Amino acid sequence: MAISYSSGIGRTKNSSVGIDRLRIDFDSNLRRWFGRNIGLWHSRSQYFFDEEKAINLEMYINISKLNQGDSGFESYRFNWWCEDEKDFFIKRPTYKSKGEIIAQLQGHQLIRHSSYLSDSSGISNIRQVDEHELIFESNYDNWHVLEHTRLIDQDKFRSRTIYSWFNDKLKIVENHHETRIKNPN
């Protein structure tokens, strides 16, 4: 892909330099944003399923960066667990009370080895709203998931809102307020 621009003298020139520079800036911004999320988080979440009453749940999320390896892409490990599981996971077996997802950042996509609602691998397309917020859009096993994640107050807090459609019907809306417990930086 090339960008056309005018030199101001009536001629148009093509350049891929502009696109390459934009791609480098975008990739650097994404790596920096993911780096800001590394650490242990306490998540207070509220789930809305169809017409049911809201359900509150607390869990912990630990995000760590893995060694880059030969691929040249940055990889991350997402671990989560609940200390008080209640009956939330018994009533909803597609949800996991603990688990791990390994994901690799490749350009504007996050390649997940598994997904939260499924063991299937998946690709999340990433859009950057500003330096503090990303939007992830994923499709796997008839699920369409839209997640907004925003870092707040110099990365002490995160706000996540997740909308999940199954077979084109909105099934789950989640609100997560997360507080950083441990920052390895």
State where each predicted segment sits.
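Edge beta-strand at a domain terminus
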Residues: 148-157, 161-185
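A short, structured loop/turn motif at beta-sheet edges
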Residues: 66-70, 127-131, 150-156
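Short, surface-exposed coil-to-beta transition loops
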Residues: 56-58, 119-122, 143-147, 159-160, ...
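Beta-turn initiation residues at beta-strand->coil junctions
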Residues: 45-47, 115, 138, 161-165
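Phosphate-end processing signature that detects enzymes handling 5′-triphosphorylated RNA
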Residues: 133-137, 141-148, 152-157
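Contiguous, well-ordered beta-strand patches that form the walls/edges
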Residues: 80-137
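Amphipathic/hydrophobic helical signal segments and adjacent flexible N-terminal regions
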Residues: 1-98, 172-173, 179-185
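Short, hydrophobic/aromatic-rich segments at coil-to-beta transitions
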Residues: 38-42, 73-76, 108-111, 129-136, ...
